[in-house]
UniProtKB/Swiss-Prot annotation:
The gene is rpsD. Residues 35-44 have a biased composition (Basic and acidic residues). Belongs to the universal ribosomal protein uS4 family. This is Small ribosomal subunit protein uS4. One of the primary rRNA binding proteins, it binds directly to 16S rRNA where it nucleates assembly of the body of the 30S subunit. With S5 and S12 plays an important role in translational accuracy. SUPFAM superfamilies: Alpha-L RNA-binding motif (SSF55174). One of its GO terms (molecular function) is rRNA binding. Residues 26-46 are annotated as: Disordered. It comes from Limosilactobacillus reuteri (strain DSM 20016).
Amino acid sequence: MSRYTGPSWRVSRRLGVSLSGTGKELARRAYAPGDHGRDRRGKLSEYGTQLREKQKLRFMYGMTERQFSNLFVRAGKIKEGTHGANFMALLERRLDNMVYRLGLATTRRQARQLVNHGHITVDGKRVDIPSYEVKVGQIIAVRDKSKNLDIIKNAVEAVVSRPSYVDFDADKLEGKLNRIPAREDMNADIDEALIVEFYNK
């Protein structure tokens, strides 16, 4: 299954969650898109509830179904912690997400583009793979040639706060993952237990 590249606001309204993290998609119209959007949300079945939760998280991180399910399987092989929390931590450690969390981009989609276009380095080496798994202590930085990009400077200036599991040097435009993200650090609007139930059926 290919990655969705259409308008994120349509998916946000359909799933009832802000995929950009800004909340703007739902500010004016909190119902699903289309002529019957206001009336479309009836009571979901157990399967429907699990599927919607899975789709919310998958679209939030901008992943294909194959990428998402493969990472879920990997999380299940981690011996410590719960399957759901380990899965969430692996999602957070994707390079595109870390670029977003450091405040080098205003959305995950924008962060993915920065990585794809070669603007980001890890430990001094250019990495253009959004799914690259960042390890604790690795330095994520903007390439010297890219430091004057308005899209990056504007994103850094707009940051209000950063998660406690990252450190950031605004002068150097670089940061790092200082520890594995704990479940309480991450999105409280996601019920990962529903996703575990969905895949374990």
